[in-house]
């Protein structure tokens, strides 16, 4: 036994000999000589090549060939170059791992490099100052590895275009300092560790190898592998250098200060140094080692402080956000995907969670395509009880399965309104919808869209179902629709906006008008099923009862005709429409608790109740309609005595009719001649004209005398040839609603780049009375050319998205144009004006002895609401609430500014109550909502069909207007001291529904510009002022002017009709439109047809894809 052990020791001594300084120097110098020698040769070759090229330029292209080339090369000098190029190209393909052979070669080189590193680890167990004998078998294995590395090095050198750059690459340095010593060991018959630790740098190729093997596929895994390879290769290389110098000692001391340090101890020392801890149990004693530790500590501060935390974060994030969401039975949740950023999530949570304040019972699962940022992660932690984040995409079935879309209440898709390409953003969201519907067709989807022309693709998805709650929120359609209403009536844009925003900021009003405005902000659009005690009653009766007894303003109902499948939303229906069972009502009220009174109302229990707070659920179970309707009407008649005008007022405008179809008569309908016959689209809802070439509508500054516009609409657009289309068709459609006669339509004059309008024109060419002035709103000459001084409204549309360094600059052009237009004030002396001029100009000062002036009415769109302070400064009023948001600003209260940022809140509205969203779409788009679109697409009604009854009712939509108390038909309502008296009197006698006021800010002298502010749903006891203007829902057949002879000519101050509202049968009007050459058939009940309708013709117009319009028409 002892003899065997002695033999092994003797054998090990034979294979290990002491390495002298000369042997170590031979290994080191071989690498240095190869490196510097090769570098010098390459430099000399490059200099010689430059000299030869210069010589070739001087002596001609054949100068070098004549001196150095043989005759055979002269005969065919390009043949060798051709084969050289082909061979080089094949090598490049091989080394880039683009072929299977190349991939095998790259993987083989990496594996052999790791094998060589393992051999180094084995040899490092022996003392560094000992040399292994060549009889060791491991030495032969390492020699074969390095021989293959030499071959691979030669291929890389051959394929390199820049040889010097290749020579200085890290992989080349590793090969130069590890391959030559191996061949030196073969010559010296001994092997030394030397610089073979540099093979550890080959670990940097690990991410590339893993990608070739398809082990890692995601960006996070690639990033994690790169960080790990950098840290590990740095550890091993630094430990190898310390292992070498500490065991060898300083060269100038002949190794007298060396110490025995194993490779594991070297790794331990490097790790302690990298973490900047340093326990002191293992330290460097050599000068070289200590100098290296100093520089390595500085480098490790960067490496450890950045890479290690990032690796931990990637590893934890991948594990944290890749877990599937566990749906709990009985707990509701929704999935939100698309544009998941800190801004979009903040806006969504603010609006969505506010709807259920105090009782959040719906969990929100965010499906993001990238891990959340630090800010987003912090926000989610603040709502950790109701939010979950999962990394994935809605385009993959496995990710949809992880978030359990099949069990979700709905899937909401967020859009990015600030993206550079709106069309691509819509397309990506449409693909998400298609993926979700393919995965689980019954999933309810609510999607945000940026451009209205892309909505048609969603309706073509086979599993898209409007009736199941699928809905579209189109930013361009709603935003431009709001602005269009503000163009038709001052303040209406603000009035409609206040009904859909949430105001939580606590403010303290300084002026009386601010108190009225803030009280109006408390009101919202709410829905509630009406009590069955209202069955059989007319809408005016129910609305009056709700207003007086419950202090609720009922403005619309959802009605389903007997012979029609689509439910229609009807604003202020006529007395012909009677309520059915479980009718859905739309109210303007402050809280959902208040509108519950309309559900609990009982004619038996609450007929004598005067306090609306006492109306609650009663114990009545069996109710008879015959017993309940009569008492209800008696209550209303008894309450009428206080507000009813005299019997001889407006007896000819009675709303009591027996026909089930609205009949228009000549006594209250403006008359047009046959020469001015209207042409409508096939739905009967919009005015239409034959396709107009663009050059026919382009105006010239020199022709101003030929187009003296008055009472027109000026729209300033800042797009160019490369801007995203904003969809001006959505702006024009509400202004061309068919419930206006052709004479009532206002000219629309666009100012902007002609190149931009050339791209938009195919969507506008079939709308009448549109003009284009090439130019800019920043140039005063262009404004004067379109007679902006005489316009009824000048709207400044926001600039299409541009990539800017600051979001505060997105409204620069808009603000500058506003400043430019506001500077154009028209002043004139008071003495030469007539009373009629004063009455019809609300912006004129009425104080004698003072010079009066008129400011051009402006409506400015802001993309960034924080820029409102620029507009406030222009207004010149110091009455704004300081430090508040846009919706509390003076400019917003007066209706001169609009921002579409509040449209984000409609996503929550669409989920909780999509009926409110449908009402909003109907209000701002001229009568089109999702139900209308569904019927139009399903029945292809835009192709035109025969029959006239539905066409007649298609034009009888209600329209909002702004009426004066003195100069219109409201002047005969007696009494009208309070808003409650006006509401009941106008509803009973005229069928007009009053919903708000447009009041002077101050009757004092300092309000020289006669600015007005909006009051949404005034209180019943609110006292009226003689100067008040009233927002009203006016039936189509009612003439608002006090003089019927001037019914078609309405002054701006006295009567301003606005947006078209879907009157009871507007969906019926979309069902069967007349074809191009047909006339309206006679109505029933022996009524005479209106000449206006007799001369109206209908032409087909695709409401959803304007590009399909036949240009030949």
Swiss-Prot record:
Q: Which domain of life is it from?
A: Eukaryota
Q: Which residues lie on this side of the membrane: Cytoplasmic?
A: 46-101, 159-165, 210-226, 312-1113
Activity regulation summary: Regulated by changes in cytosolic pH; activated by alkalization. Not activated by intracellular Ca(2+). VU0546110 acts as a selective inhibitor. The auxiliary subunit LRRC52 shifts the activation of KCNU1 to more negative potentials at a given pH.
Q: Which GO terms of type biological process are on file?
A: establishment of localization in cell; fertilization; potassium ion transmembrane transport; potassium ion transport; protein stabilization
Which reaction is this enzyme known to catalyze?
K(+)(in) = K(+)(out)
Question: Which segments carry the region annotation Disordered?
Answer: 1047-1091
Alphabetically sorted, this entry's keywords are: Calcium, Cell membrane, Cell projection, Cilium, Flagellum, Ion channel, Ion transport, Membrane, Potassium, Potassium channel, Potassium transport, Transmembrane, Transmembrane helix, Transport, Voltage-gated channel
Compartments (UniProt record):
Cell membrane; Cell projection, Cilium, Flagellum membrane
Which residue numbers delimit the RCK N-terminal domain?
A: 331-473, 710-881
Q: What does this protein do?
A: Testis-specific potassium channel activated by both intracellular pH and membrane voltage that mediates export of K(+). Represents the primary spermatozoan K(+) current. The channel underlies a pH-triggered membrane hyperpolarization during the process of sperm capacitation, as sperm encounter the alkaline environment near the ovum in the female reproductive tract, thereby playing an essential for male fertility.
Q: How does it assemble?
A: Homotetramer; which constitutes the activated potassium channel. Interacts with LRRC52; this interaction changes channel gating properties, such as shifting gating to more negative potentials at a given pH.
Q: What domain notes does the record hold? A: The S4 segment, which is characterized by a series of positively charged amino acids at every third position, is part of the voltage-sensor. The pore-forming domain (also referred as P region) is imbedded into the membrane, and forms the selectivity filter of the pore. It contains the signature sequence of potassium channels that displays selectivity to potassium.
**What protein am I looking at?**
Potassium channel subfamily U member 1
Organism source for this protein?
Rattus norvegicus
Q: What is the lineage of its organism?
A: Eukaryota, Metazoa, Chordata, Craniata, Vertebrata
